From Swiss-Prot:
Family according to the record: Belongs to the HMBS family.
Entry keywords, A to Z: Porphyrin biosynthesis, Transferase
Native species: Thiobacillus denitrificans (strain ATCC 25259 / T1)
Protein's gene: hemC
Coiled coil: none
Additional notes on this entry: The porphobilinogen subunits are added to the dipyrromethane group.
Cofactor: dipyrromethane
Protein name from the UniProt record: Porphobilinogen deaminase
Length: 306
């Protein structure tokens, strides 16, 4: 192929991700011209409502898939945490690339750590996952929704609308904003979203030529971890509308997976772990999902607003 076109959201972070993949592809295939097709998704347009109320993860993906289906693009670059658990017919995930830091970051102009915040402090977050963990572990804090791209969220903090905000560390680091991070939340303190920090590349199903060109970008360890995490989310119906997190780590051919399901107000918080062979990550994810279901996860999920 002489030309490859990458479909991407137009936010600064999404464009960084697309440019990163473009640069890697140019290194791998210097004979090939690689372009980026910037697009605005519905998730980028609706900024006054929390993601959990407007449909969740697929909001950042669908327009890119339309471009793929129409042949306007050959691949789409996503943050894996935004990719729905089931792709529509006609598409496949060709690559799960090497992961940036998967943890959540604490950002504040006044405090060094989440545990330093006094009662009544206002914390901004965009996700039910972070909100549920905050409410469960820090019930004395006030949690308020925070939408917009990374720059917008930081601006709202700097304007004094929040005492602190929580963001994905990966996004801040990729944008060169790592200095804004006051501290990183341990996985025990804030279990990340499935796939957080990893990039995924989606293509049209059966496009073997593009799949072969992308193959060197796949990171087997990250892919195994993310597949296990996504299986937990798949079994439990995870989306932006479900307070759920899962994080896997790899050691000596084994996966250690931790995850939780909670009520949004943190009043019920179920957490567990599973371990298994990295060669079958879905089985490890299924084992953790089964443990959470045995604790009563289904009742928690069924009680969530539709």
């Amino acid at each position: 192929m002489h030309t490859l076109t990458i479909a991407s959201r137009e936010s600064a972070l999404a464009m960084w991700q697309a440019e990163h993949i473009r640069d890697r592809l140019r290194e791998l295939h210097p004979e090939c011209k690689v372009n980026i097709l910037g697009m605005t998704t519905r998730g980028d347009q609706i900024l006054d409502v929390t993601l959990s109320k407007i449909g969740g993860k697929g909001l950042f993906v669908k327009e890119l898939e339309v471009a793929l289906a129409a042949g306007e693009a050959d691949l789409a670059v996503h943050s894996m945490k935004d990719v729905p658990m089931e792709l529509p017919p006609g598409f496949e995930l060709a690559v799960i690339g090497e992961r940036e830091d998967p943890r959540d970051a604490f950002v504040s102009n006044r405090y060094a750590r989440l545990s330093d915040l006094p009662p009544g402090s206002v914390v901004g977050t965009s996700s039910l996952r972070r909100e549920a963990q905050l409410r469960a572990r820090y019930p004395h804090l006030t949690v308020k929704p925070l939408r917009g791209n990374v720059g917008t969220r930081l601006k709202k903090l700097d304007e004094g609308q929040f005492d602190a905000i929580l963001l994905a560390a990966a996004g801040l680091k990729r944008l060169g904003l790592g200095a804004r991070i006051k501290s990183l939340l341990s996985v025990e303190e804030s279990i990340p979203a499935a796939g957080q920090g990893a990039l995924g590349i989606e293509i049209r199903s059966g496009n073997t030529a593009v799949a072969a060109m992308l193959a060197p970008l796949n990171d087997p360890v990250t892919a195994a971890c993310v597949r296990a995490e996504r299986q937990v989310s798949r079994v439990l119906g995870g989306s932006c509308q479900v307070p759920l997190g899962a994080h896997a780590s790899y050691k000596d051919g084994r996966l250690l997976l931790e995850g939780f399901v909670a009520k949004p107000d943190g009043s019920r918080f179920l957490v567990d772990r599973a371990e298994g062979d990295a060669s079958d990550p879905e089985a490890v994810g299924q084992a953790l999902a089964d443990k959470l279901l045995a604790q009563g996860a289904r009742a928690v999920l069924d009680a969530l607003p539709a």
